[in-house]
């Protein structure tokens, strides 16, 4: 980088006032005075009155450095000189007055660098003012304010709209979402074994996972184990849970939930329990399920037939008897085929308990 040349003349200048610099410097001074009048530039933040010397300038003989990085020249007897733009009182001609602003005109790159340095000095002298936001910043701030001040577009605007949306989303949302399926196996008690008593109970959740599966000892003597259908044998009753204890455990699971079953009234009768009709789903009396199986709507179809027709699966086969876990899982899968349609029907025609 080439050094700047300073042409100094210590002779007597002409009596007329020295020029204040080129057009760019005059424009700079004009803007600085405007900022001073408006209060943006205080005296404390004004650039130094003396023309700053570049760091590349060597110190002259007799000069001493000061705190602000300039070099102090010893004072000499004052002479009558014309007022210069830097107010130093030294006789400077036009070239000397603007030498720190105008670099050597030999190279264009040096001129651009000098202008950048000048702009940096001017900006550093200005007080810190909040800069105006750009377009992108304005847009982002407007979006943030709109999100805070206005409700979301997807949110319902009033209670009527919210009610209509909830109605369209399905009646199943208004009912308890916890749903279980139950199946019970009975044995014969009483005279000639005509009384059906609970001997095994299985409960599965919505996904078919087993929540409860226990053998239950009836309070009365077992006359007929009905092994061909129930799968219950004498050895199953050795460590079976007493009916009273098992009933309390089962009702604790069923309370407050939607209970699905096939011919479920028989299971509730064996449990000596009444479940609300609004929370009961009996797959033996669901017309849409019969329609899917190409059966008469009002006919009572067996669980085995519906499972084979709709799930393409065989259950209750062999001579070992039924599995209450398998039957409960099949019942839940059948109900899930018509769940949305049947829940909407029940919402329009709620059953009375």
UniProtKB/Swiss-Prot annotation:
Gene Ontology molecular function, alphabetical: 3'-5'-RNA exonuclease activity; exonuclease activity; RNA binding
Record gene name: ISG20L2
TM region positions: none
Basic and acidic residues bias: start-end ranges: 14-23, 54-63
Comp. bias (Basic residues): 24-35, 135-151
Pfam families per the UniProt record, alphabetical: RNase_T
Chief place of localization: nucleus
Protein name, entry field: Interferon-stimulated 20 kDa exonuclease-like 2
Statement: the UniProt record of this protein carries the keyword Ligase: no
Domain of life: Eukaryota
């Amino acid at each position: 980088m080439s050094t700047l040349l300073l042409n100094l003349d210590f002779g007597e200048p002409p009596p007329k006032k020295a020029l204040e610099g080129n057009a760019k410097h005059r424009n700079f001074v004009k803007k600085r005075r405007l900022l001073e009048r408006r209060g943006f530039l205080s005296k404390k933040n004004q650039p130094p009155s003396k023309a700053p010397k570049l760091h590349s300038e060597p110190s002259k003989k007799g000069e001493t450095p000061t705190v602000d990085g300039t070099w102090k020249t010893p004072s000499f007897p004052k002479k009558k000189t014309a007022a210069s733009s830097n107010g130093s009182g030294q006789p400077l001609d036009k070239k000397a007055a603007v030498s720190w602003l105008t670099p050597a005109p030999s190279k264009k790159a040096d001129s651009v660098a000098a202008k950048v340095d000048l702009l940096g000095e001017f900006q550093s002298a200005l007080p810190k003012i909040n800069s105006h936001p750009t377009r992108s910043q304005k847009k982002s701030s407007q979006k943030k304010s709109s999100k805070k001040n206005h409700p979301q577009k997807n949110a319902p605007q009033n209670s009527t709209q919210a009610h209509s949306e909830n109605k369209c989303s399905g009646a199943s949302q208004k009912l308890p979402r916890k749903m279980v399926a139950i199946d019970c196996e009975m044995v014969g008690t009483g005279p000639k074994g005509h009384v059906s008593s609970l001997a095994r109970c299985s409960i599965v959740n919505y996904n078919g996972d087993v929540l409860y599966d226990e053998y239950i000892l009836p309070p009365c003597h077992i006359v007929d184990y009905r092994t061909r259908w129930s799968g219950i044998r004498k050895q199953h009753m050795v460590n079976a849970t007493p009916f009273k204890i098992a009933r309390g455990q089962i009702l604790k699971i069923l309370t407050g939930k939607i209970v699905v079953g096939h011919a479920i009234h028989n299971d509730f009768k064996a449990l000596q329990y009444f479940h609300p009709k609004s929370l009961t789903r009996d797959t033996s009396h669901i017309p849409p399920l019969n329609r899917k199986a190409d059966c008469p709507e009002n006919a009572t179809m067996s669980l085995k037939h519906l499972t084979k027709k709709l799930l393409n699966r065989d259950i209750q086969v062999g001579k070992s008897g039924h599995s209450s876990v398998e039957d409960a899982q099949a019942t839940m899968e059948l109900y899930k085929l018509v769940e949305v349609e049947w829940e909407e029907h029940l919402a329009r025609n709620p059953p009375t308990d």
